[in-house]
């Protein structure tokens, strides 16, 4: 089994202001035990900024982007040193990969990242992945490591994404304010009712909360990878989940495993939205047809040819994602028009489809 394991700041600090060394030892022992069983583990880890706080003695408060990037630069070295030392203690080698959204957005970089990860796993090396916070600005940030872990699970075609957190899983209500709230053991599909249970933001040290975890679950399960959200303070949580024990909340994968190109389309961050009319929405949803300009009612966002866009039904429901053949401004000029008018309106044509069905992933 190939598992992507995501560790958030709240798990790594055990609720304190510092990295909790005993917790890190336990987690690495768990990873080593699962690896010894023949499973492959990819680790997505937060904690760099906290490690930087700890190393430089900065007081815990909100900081500017430049200060956070400094802390991440210092802390990533400290964090990776800890992981390397602990991995060696249990007979494992480790490797570091720092990624940004562009590494998922641009196909060549996406393929290079996948090749590197496959090489690590084939040689028994534990990849440790974090977002490259020292260079990432808003335009190239994935945003949080929950979402990053879902993209990584998609990238390596993982059999399971395990997100360890400071909560036992997803509840029917916030258990802090609703004592009668109960744990939801299985989620068959992420629906508006599930989103309503997301609650607020995460810990003051991290960037995630239950909302980002549900978002990660939606991304991964759409691509065919099941997701488990479980408490990070449980002994041997990774091994127990891999062995089939029911811990936390399991989000079931739906649909078949997507082919590699369509996994990439789904992983890429969407640059815009196309609002379809009823006929086009029906043709795309029910017949798997390509999207023609005539079926587009509205174009939102600023994107270039080849970028990923969301396709929305008239009621706003997302039907799928696809690679657009035309840039946003040109699509605005041809939307609602017949395909034979494209060349007359634009002075060129890349074909009659706005999004070809081969470049389209239905959700």
Swiss-Prot record:
EC class of the enzyme, as a word: transferase
Boundaries of every PUA domain copy: 271-349
Pathway(s) served: Amino-acid biosynthesis; L-proline biosynthesis; L-glutamate 5-semialdehyde from L-glutamate: step 1/2
A molecular-function term among this protein's GO annotations: ATP binding
Known catalytic reactions: L-glutamate + ATP = L-glutamyl 5-phosphate + ADP
GO CC terms in record: cytosol
Alphabetized UniProt keyword annotations: Amino-acid biosynthesis, ATP-binding, Cytoplasm, Kinase, Nucleotide-binding, Proline biosynthesis, Transferase
Signal peptide extent: none
GO terms of biological process kind: L-proline biosynthetic process; proline biosynthetic process
EC number(s) reported in the record: 2.7.2.11
Family: Belongs to the glutamate 5-kinase family.
NCBIfam families: proB
Protein name: Glutamate 5-kinase
Species assigned in the record: Deinococcus radiodurans (strain ATCC 13939 / DSM 20539 / JCM 16871 / CCUG 27074 / LMG 4051 / NBRC 15346 / NCIMB 9279 / VKM B-1422 / R1)
